[in-house]
Design a protein with these regions (language model features):
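Acceptor-substrate binding/catalytic loop of class I
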Residues: 172-189
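A short glycine-rich, Lys/Arg-flanked "PGG" loop and its adjoining helix->strand segment in the class I
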Residues: 137-150
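Conserved class I S-adenosyl-L-methionine
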Residues: 2-56, 58-67, 152-174
Length: 255
């Protein structure tokens, strides 16, 4: 798989951004069960919370496509005011433990044309959506529009073991069963999209050097931690790790 231009960049009208229906499903959640899956989510949550720690207490966060409930619960527990927006009511199912208690709001909207005024939320998060987006540059632009301060999202980098993703796809399908092909990105593509939205990438957190499918295949969290620790210390993960979590901040006047 190679980085490709945004397939929907020239015409976003009428495009249905509904990949979050799949990532909000119970079927998708099974990928993250067991020790390795929990470890994946622990790394993701830890990095995300560190990237957002400059926000004031009680800051408002919009989690776009977050019906997978992979980050909203951690944001809620950290004291943020969280709204999750999804493309369909079915995306709210996994959030019920929080929405039914009033700890989180869920709203349905067109994710390519969010129904919020400019700068409505202190920060916006978006996980598991970009590589399946019908118009990824349009999605980033919309995240930037409604964010007052920061946008945090993840993406699979081509500057990583993902360069072998086409060869590993059959193994990935055999292990995950419901896997889909996905877009890969260069860091420059992501930086450019944020620049066009009036933001600048300030921090990047590559997560794993080895492909996640190999960790799932090994199915041993302690072994995965052991394998990733030395390459992280050597700085290899920083250069060649994926997925990458980035935080982009709104440009100030004159910046």
């Amino acid at each position: 798989m190679t980085p490709r231009p945004d397939p929907g960049a020239s015409n976003r009208s009428g495009l249905a951004e509904d990949a979050d229906i799949g990532t909000s499903s119970e079927d998708y959640a099974r990928r993250f069960r067991g020790g390795v899956g929990r470890w994946f989510l622990e790394i993701q949550a830890r990095n995300t919370l560190k990237l957002l720690r400059e926000l004031p207490a009680g800051a408002s966060i919009l989690d776009v496509g977050g019906g997978h409930a992979q980050i909203a619960p951690q944001l809620i527990d950290a004291g943020y005011e969280v709204t999750v927006v999804g493309s369909d009511p079915v995306c709210a199912v996994r959030l019920a433990p929080w929405t039914t208690k009033g700890r989180c709001r869920f709203e349905v909207a067109n994710l390519q044309a969010l129904p919020y005024a400019d700068r409505s939320f202190d920060a916006v998060t978006c996980f598991r959506l970009l590589p399946h987006s019908v118009s990824w540059s349009g999605l980033i632009g919309e995240l930037c529009r409604v964010a007052r301060r920061s946008v945090v999202l993840d993406y699979p980098s081509i500057r990583s073991a993902n360069i072998l993703s086409s060869r590993l796809f059959q193994l990935k399908r055999a292990i995950e069963l419901n896997t889909r092909e996905f877009l890969l990105f260069t860091p420059s593509q992501i930086h450019t999209a944020f620049t066009e939205g009036g933001f600048i990438v300030r921090k990047e957190r590559p997560q794993f050097l080895l492909p996640m499918v190999l960790h799932r295949w090994g199915n041993h969290a302690a072994l995965s931690r052991f394998a990733e620790a030395p390459v992280r210390l050597l700085g290899l993960t920083r250069w060649f790790g994926s997925p990458i979590i980035v935080r982009a901040d709104r440009r100030t006047a004159g910046a």
